[in-house]
Every structure is written in C-alpha cells, then in structure tokens.
Amino acid sequence: LRSHYTRKWDLTHAPSICNHCAVGCNLIMGERYGQVRRVLNRYNEQVNGYFICDKGRFNYEYINNTDTRILKSRIGATTASEAEVIATLRNLLSGGRTIAIGSSVASVEANYLLRQLVGMENFYADIPFDTWESVATIRKVYESGNARILTLKEVEQAEGVLVLGEDVYQSAPRLALAIRQAARNKPLRKSQKINIPAWHANAVKTFIGMDRGPLFVAHPQPTWLDEMSLQAFRKTSAEIEQLAETLVALLEGKDVPTGKVADEAKHILNEWADCKSVAIVCGTSLQNKKLIELSAKIASLLQQ
C-alpha cells in the first residue's frame, strides 16, 4: 500500500462493482498511470450501503499484475494478429467438433457468449456437477417467485435469521455484517420500549449487554457468526437438511417425531414468534440442492 500512495486529486475515478462474491458491492476505483491505486465504497442503499469488506477494498493487486494478462494474441506459440485469430477460430468452429470450457472467474456475459459460439451441448461451465445442480436450483427459486429474495438492507432490518449450511463470512462478508446487525434488532426494540433512542449508542449498549436476537447458525464447522448467534448447531449436511425438513413440517402444521431435532426446530420457531421479519440464508457451499429447496420453502411459509 505504501508504494501505491497517491494524492486523491491525482487519481482518476470510475464507478465499478466488486467481483469477489455474489453480493456485488458498489465501488469507486481510483487509477493513476494505468494502475489501480485505491478502491473506495460507492454508496448504494439497497446493496452495500456505506460499507465494503477488506477483501473488496484491498484485494485489487491482481488487476495490476501484467504477468497473468494476455498481452499478445497467439496461435500455438506464434504471435498472431486479431484477424488471424478470428480466421482460425472461424475454421475451428465451422467443423462442428469444438468444445468450450468456461470459467467461474469470468463474467456471466463472457461465459454466455462462449456458450453461444459452440452450443449448449459443447459447453462446460468449469464447476463440479453438484455445484452446477445447486446453482440451477437457486435459479429455479428465483424464477418461481415463491420465496422473496431479500436485499442486504432488508436482511439488516430482519429480527430473526437462520443460516443453513453456509459460512457467510467466507462466501459473502458484507452479508455477514448485515446478519450481525440483524442480530441486534430485537434487543434494540426492547431498549426503545423504555425510550432509549437508537442513536444513543452507549446507553443502548449498556441496556442490551450480551442480549442477542434469534440468530441461528447450522454448519458442520465453527463460523465467525457463532459468537453473535443465540444458538449454533454443529451438524452434517444431512442433519442440517433434516432440521430444515422439520421446520417445514412444523410450519405446515404437521406432526413431527419427538426428539432432539424436533426440539431444536420448535425452539427456533418459538424465538421467532414475535419477530416482525425473518431472513433465511443458504448457499452452495455444502452442494446440497435439497437444502436450498427447503430453505426457499421455509422462507415461503414464513411469508404467508
């Protein structure tokens, strides 16, 4: 960072979007002499607000690394012009026996255009099949409209949160901050009942103490959200799926077998009883498409 020090009036700025996770925080990129020198937050009320994570702010050096860029077009080991490359590609594609391998670090648009060139049946997305199934399931959830997808702002305003099988600090740090803020909302409501204004941080902190809102985390390994949670469950992927199935059954008014899982599910729902809104968080980390479907089902039932 010391070698990148530049006075702000010497920088050329442009709006951008962070590509390190799926949240897509809004950024302002500062450039000088053809190199990125500074990344700042760009306010967007519905996405990242006033904050970005350290990864988004400081992890930009790869952009300046010329060793990993394609500086010259090549055909084999021979440098070629753009026209020669296009002509060679045209000949390859005309034979109808060409496959294409996409990249999970390339843009959606680049992968789409590559797939259009070779056709759906000749395109490989460069992700494991289980992950592909999970992503396809998430797409179906979006398209169905049965469960409303919350913005970060809405997650921050939720009073109850359930994280199923996702280490949010690793996969989406800005979402993790929103969940931590959500965990304070229910205790904050208690402080407002005795007329402590929300802006009076010290008084609110003294009143709340270690009181935590109904944030529940179910994950095979410890996560950094555990310290803020009302209860953290150490469970395998199959056990988390069983917990989600039990929650769905209880929300549908069905009878469930007595036992530890039923008690945990009932405890979660009891804590959510007076919550104004609840957020369900799930992802592709465990590569369990059934868990994603159950998470969407829970969210849909809670909205009814």
Task: Place the predicted regions along the sequence by residue.
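Catalytic alpha/large subunits of respiratory electron-transfer oxidoreductases
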Residues: 1-304
